[in-house]
Amino acid sequence: MSNQTERKIEMWRMTIALVLAAAAFVIAGCGGGSGNTDVAPPPEDADAPATGTLKFFAYGDTIVDPMLDPFRKQNPDLELKTASFDSNKAAAAKLAGGFEADVVEVCTDEMSPLTARGLLRPLDGKAVPAFHDLAFSGAPEVRDADGNVLFVPASAGPQGLIVNSDQLDPDTITSYADLFDPAYVGEVALEATPLTAIGAGALAMGLDDPMNLSDEEVEQVKEYLLDHRDQFRAFAESDASMVNLFKSGEVQLADGGRGTTQTMIEDGVPVQWIAPKEGSLSWVCGLAITSKAQNIDAAYKLINYYASPQAQAISGDMGFVAMNPKALPLVSPAFRKTADPRNLKNAIPETEPENADAYDRAWQEVQAG
């Protein structure tokens, strides 16, 4: 699986700089709001190949050739231009500053800079026939206040528990609370991102809505993490770091995704992924049409492709969950277990809290000790 952990870390590190950049754009009169935020009209002929130029702005692991080559073959007269970003905050700053894109990738834990500036154009859900087949299509974050579809879910990754099955009995690991069991002191790692770390701590404490904690609850989780700080061998700042901690034998238990677990297995590490009884935290990303999109027909064509069983099978072979269950038979047998959308059952979408700054400050204090 590609490095989703690094995505989130980069997002939080860039917050202050990008807020200042946003202010500069507003002062300069370059802010959002001049685009069209009406529902994007569907193509007159949805089956016709796309033509013209389509500009696609997304995370780097979304715009890889194995995923895009079939779309290019289906639309030979379309010029597809791609560009990547490191966070939705960075994407919003560029789009508000005049960067042109027709389709942009959005993630539920960081999309507010795009929505607050009016940089997204709602979609006609009927123009995406597979929409209701997709995992998380019914999540409230997918729609705006008027009930219009803002983006089409295209990828997700459940965060559960990773256990070294040679050292620990996987049947005894069932809860986020196990990360804090003193029996495993010094052999546990925690992903070093505010939402995931605070979320895992909250669930371990019995708080069942980890993305909507009050400031007081965030403070309680912070104190809980500080009280158990010696429990953790490391706070892993990337998927690669987490893999290395298990390979070296330093860590026997951690929170993490199925893709990271699969990477370890391929490297010969005896690990097993476990869905916690509280529910797995999960990042969720998808594709949206920008408010200044020029090629609406091609934008719908691309979004429908990403929602298709064919594209989702490719995504499954890349280590992601296949958001369309009809893709599962097309996924390579080696990846079918990790790609199964049933992995997202009872998942808790990571969304951007209204008091995200409180999560950030709390986690910084935990890391500082």
Give the ranges of each region predicted by the language model.
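Bacterial signal peptide processing site
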Residues: 31-34
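A ligand-binding cleft/hinge motif common to bilobed small-molecule-binding domains
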Residues: 110-115, 247, 252-270, 319
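Extracellular/periplasmic bilobal clamshell ligand-binding domains
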Residues: 332-369
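Extracytoplasmic ligand-binding site segments that recognize negatively charged/polar headgroups
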Residues: 58-65, 100-101, 105-247
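Mature extracytoplasmic/periplasmic domains
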Residues: 281, 285, 290-347
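C-terminal motif of bacterial Sec signal peptides marking the signal peptidase cleavage site
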Residues: 26-29
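Periplasmic-binding protein-like
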Residues: 219-228, 265-291
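Early extracytoplasmic/lumenal segment of secretory-pathway proteins
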Residues: 41-113, 243
